[in-house]
Amino acid sequence: MLQPPNILTIAGSDSGGGAGIQADLKTMTAMGAFGMSVITALTAQNGLGVTGIHAPGPEFAALQLRTVLDGFPVHGAKTGMLFNAGIIHALADILDAETFPLVVDPVCVSTSGHQLMEDDGIAALRDRLFPRADLLTPNRPEAEAFTGVAIKTDDDAIEAGTRLLDMGVKAVLMKGGHVEGKPVFVTDWLLEKGHEPVALRQPHVDTQNSHGTGCTLSAAIATQLGFGLPLRIAVTKAQEFLNLALRHSYAPGKGFGPVNHMAGLKK
């Protein structure tokens, strides 16, 4: 049997288990990879929201990353919640020397509206990690925050994605999940330097149990890149994984439930 790829998540911990590193590791495992983690923040949260955040110092975040890299080859990685500029700079100093595929999910605000990044982290993320990113996966509010473009149409999404490419990222997946009403399809736009934008559509799933969707998608893409797939195919497979997880999502407790990462493993 071929050995599975080693995939790394650099993100915050969700005590409720639906998002963050918990969602990432479930995704990697369900896809047949070996998941590893660098924890950038501890969050106290559940399906109702975030009640507190505790972040380790930048030195300990960097120590986790160096220790993982010293012990394991990494075939793909993603970043999620990074919380502040100090952590971002400490991690970027190490990541700049690495060549594995890196998916950057620019997490700024939780689904419940809680700020997950301090104000100084926005510029640090843009300046230090965007140039290292093989793919950036912003949702609409995140893309608007980084570009200043009010996204209401597909043309707006493409304009915002183009501006993000100009900031140094190699490719951008403009996620279309933040839409009003009940559309038949959700359209994500994949933009790569030197290529025309590509519309990637998936059936819309009408559910309130969507906690951890962004984390799951970026982890799934990083995993597929770790298997050696080309970017567009990796994104498509990740979308399919997330869509299935959404269709089988449920609420194990109060509030918004998580997607079901194990849906594809059921018999």
Where are these regions (language model features)?
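Glycine-rich beta-alpha junction loops
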Residues: L42-T43, F83, C108-S110, E142, ...
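Phosphate-handling active-site elements
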Residues: M31-M36, E196-P197, Q224-A238
